């Protein structure tokens, strides 16, 4: 184990929207250090949303999608006397954001549209409208926490 807690590295806001969450999203989207490809996919998806949405702005849809997918509660395994319990715990804000980004990207990759740009745009629109696979994942996570509320006293 490390002696001290690792310092949180500050990310630069993205050049177009000046938003740090978009930078984090691009970094999570990136494969093999190809940031320019990830950036192209992200901005392309936001432009696609701008074109589709009419009065909807891509950045607003993005922010709504992240907010809708952020989990409030999750379960963590805790071993007590030979039995493993799923203990519900609150999710810290930084982890909420990280999980929301991770879920949106992973479920966008599993979609059936042709390009990643289209997949991401569709998943962001679905998440902003409180539907889609990433939103369902959040709901399932919350249901698991609710179902295991009886073990909440095992929290540490």
From Swiss-Prot:
PANTHER family found in the cross-reference section: RIBOSOMAL PROTEIN S7 (PTHR11205)
GO cellular component: small ribosomal subunit
Keyword tRNA processing listed: no
InterPro entries: Ribosomal_uS7 (IPR000235), Ribosomal_uS7_bac/org-type (IPR005717), Ribosomal_uS7_CS (IPR020606), Ribosomal_uS7_dom (IPR023798), Ribosomal_uS7_dom_sf (IPR036823)
Name of the protein in question: Small ribosomal subunit protein uS7
Quaternary data: Part of the 30S ribosomal subunit. Contacts proteins S9 and S11.
Gene that specifies this protein: rpsG
Gene Ontology BP term (one): translation
Keyword Signal: no
Molecular function via GO: rRNA binding; structural constituent of ribosome; tRNA binding
Its biological purpose: One of the primary rRNA binding proteins, it binds directly to 16S rRNA where it nucleates assembly of the head domain of the 30S subunit. Is located at the subunit interface close to the decoding center, probably blocks exit of the E-site tRNA.
Domain of life: Bacteria
Keyword field: Ribonucleoprotein, Ribosomal protein, RNA-binding, rRNA-binding, tRNA-binding
Record NCBIfam families: rpsG_bact
Family: Belongs to the universal ribosomal protein uS7 family.
The species this protein was found in: Campylobacter fetus subsp. fetus (strain 82-40)
